[in-house]
């Protein structure tokens, strides 16, 4: 044995028990080395006899190489007994990790080193794997339902995303050009939602303000959309406290501004609602008045047409009656004038009934009548009656 192979590990083997209860069969092991024999380890009658055997494999390698290689036939399987472990893990005496071979079914198998059993087991395992591969190749690939569902959902999601991208940007591949599109878009779309404090100190007079972009460390309040710049030496001590105070001031101002804007919007909303209410009420009142005016106009028009028709129907009779009354009045007036002219006023005695005296001066009475006639002649009524008389005279003449 060379100096490289002189490293040995001590392996403890436990005796294998087979057969009925109480019956024990000692495991015999033979060491292929000339200097070691079985007699040095066997010969003790204790049930729990443990033998220390030298092996050229470590315990870890022994556990990894411990595989089941059973070459018994079906009859030997039936006669072997029921004490074999059902988990499929072989005992140490049945494995090929010992120097003397394996003890299976009462027969000692030679060692795996340099034997043909190793080649036969490898050949059998290769044939078994070929058989499994042939069975797997014989099965036809079937498309299952969940495959169809997954493919259809992926296709629908892709189509909807492309349609949405096209409707928003007009370009189907706009989402895949994010890096270039972000550089080309306006800076306001990127940083317009955040109030950067150091942006005010930037040179706002030049046109480069539109190209401004934040850089460095910022203390950001995402609730109020405020960002305050921080340097590397401003994170501790008084400057950090100052930064917190500035952030608190901007946060409070933003909240007050937000609350004020909300209140103003609420007031403006109430005022707009009141204005709309008054406007709608005025429009409704105006519409109702317009409808009422149309109805009243229609009614008065009907009444006027009715009165006009009645007037045209009764106007000849009224005209005749008026003419007849005018003629009678003229006749009465002319007759009264004649009677007044022919009247001879005699001395009138006082009426005893009324106990008052009437003047005996007849000339004064005549003067009063003449004066009354002159007044009547120059009155409007007399002029109207004279005009009617002239018209009637001309009508009768013609």
UniProtKB/Swiss-Prot annotation:
User: GO BP, one example?
Assistant: nucleophagy
Q: What does this protein do?
A: Acts as a receptor for reticulophagy and nucleophagy. Directs autophagic sequestration of double-membrane vesicles derived from the nuclear envelope and perinuclear endoplasmic reticulum (pnER) into autophagosomes. Is not required for the cytoplasm-to-vacuole targeting pathway, mitophagy, pexophagy, and non-selective autophagy.
The short motif ATG11-binding is annotated over 52-59
- Effect of inactivating the gene: Partially blocks reticulophagy, and the double ATG39/ATG40 knockout almost completely blocks this pathway. Leads to abnormal morphology in the nucleus/pnER, when exposed to prolonged nitrogen starvation.
Please give, as recorded in its UniProt entry, the membrane topology of this protein. Single-pass membrane protein
Q: Where in the cell is it found?
A: Endoplasmic reticulum membrane; Preautophagosomal structure membrane
The entry describes its oligomerization and partners as:
Interacts with ATG8 and ATG11.
Where does the chain cross the membrane?
Answer: 148-164
* Keywords, comma-separated and alphabetical: Autophagy, Endoplasmic reticulum, Membrane, Transmembrane, Transmembrane helix
Show the segment(s) annotated as Disordered: 15-50
Briefly describe its induction: Expression is increased by rapamycin, which mimics nitrogen starvation by inactivating the TORC1 complex.
Q: Tell me the GO molecular function terms.
A: protein-macromolecule adaptor activity
Q: What is the protein named? A: Autophagy-related protein 39
Cellular compartments per GO CC: endoplasmic reticulum membrane; nuclear outer membrane; perinuclear endoplasmic reticulum; phagophore assembly site membrane
Motif ATG8-binding — list its residue ranges: 8-11
